[in-house]
């Protein structure tokens, strides 16, 4: 299936101007970095990351097993990718201070069998002469757009920047504007979504993650707020609570027609391929993906990831046989549509205090 002081948290758009003016090379605090990085995207907005501050330049990254997906992500591959995204956001946030965040050690793979908050990696904050090219203000602007796009193809400059960034991590970036390919991917995504919904364990897992009203979304500050998904809360709740009613007849046709209408104007499909064998690979995927998503944000473009086309075996086999990937040693691990739309709704995030583990 398919993160600053309180003032910044409350009014991020009013604070962006100040973020570019940091010139001091004093060491930033971990709290400062987390206040920015908490806006990083995570799978289903679960935000499994927690941080224990050890010293000014060392922190431990933990994951909360209650924020994993035993059904949809049993090996926690995409959770690990999300941890990589979070780490890169920490590093980008440190850039204006003349610092970056590196991984000192990965301790153990993320496991759905864990029963307590578990140590994943040790992080270090180090000074660097390298200039961070990505402006951290983009972290607050980034969104996922699941609505209709305006029909424009992804800008060539954006594509060139993404190709260059992917290569830095040993990954390949591909895209297609071929209508046949675009239609194939969108249709396959729709078929896979409805196939996944036939699984009761999948439906039950998702039902716990959906926030069917703004009140729920604001209270939990995590999960899938239906407004961000482009569906009404009442409709989505009906689908998950009364699933059989939506499996046949006019309701099924109506649901599919409505879902497909949200893909109008899609003209570019993109995908990444790279090494995808272990935690180190998945973290690298996340760090690269984080940077490229922010590059697209800098170019005023949005994306909508199609996670189910990777996690669903049948769909993935069709993707592998259809999409370009000349290097057999690399795996297509991320597919998404990219383009231009109205500014999407921002989902909520856990507070910095909820992420930091008190010692």
Give residue spans per PLM region.
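Acidic, surface-exposed loops and disordered segments
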Residues: 1-359
